[in-house]
Amino acid sequence: VTIAIVHLGAGNTASVQFALERLGAHAVVTSDAAVIADAERLVLPGVGAAGYAMTRMAELGLTDIIKGFDRPLIGLCLGQQLLFERSQENGGATMLGFIPGEVRHLDTRPDLPVPHMGWTRLEKLKDDPILDGVAEGAYAYFVHSFVCPDTTATLACADYGTEVPAMVRSGNRWGCQFHPERSAEAGARILHNFLSLPA
């Protein structure tokens, strides 16, 4: 299985590649439109700002290719946020629009720092192949200052003084707000499940 990890000039691409290769996948970090279009799976990692990511995607000629990609796709951290319509970040950014709603700044209790950084339990809300074998209450590693809206796409949430949609799905597109490549056994299981999805 050939996995294309989309490189937008920032992000945790090397650690994602290493995590996938440990599971036996052939993973390439690329911004080449032809490689991305032909991949059997697509990973959209990201750290940083939504507006910058979408601008780079457009500059590289990848926006329409990613929007039209019909095989399994997973967005990680910022990559999950990019699956939604809009973000408040950078004064407002238009995103891929697979899932309705606006990504907003994380508004939590005064005693909880933002960004949300560290290990937080996952609560599964729906059964989904991506969550097969992931224990209820498993810990995942989060680093984020913005949060996706809670929609019918939410598969799992985390409690950080407010409910954080931790995993989402729309058709053949999944998202993790956390970093599965840094989330020990639960993260490895989620990536294994992603590799095992039917194309």
Kindly label every feature range from the protein language model:
Residues 27-38:
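Short acidic low-complexity segments
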Residues 36-46:
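Short acidic/histidine-rich motifs immediately flanking catalytic phosphotransfer sites
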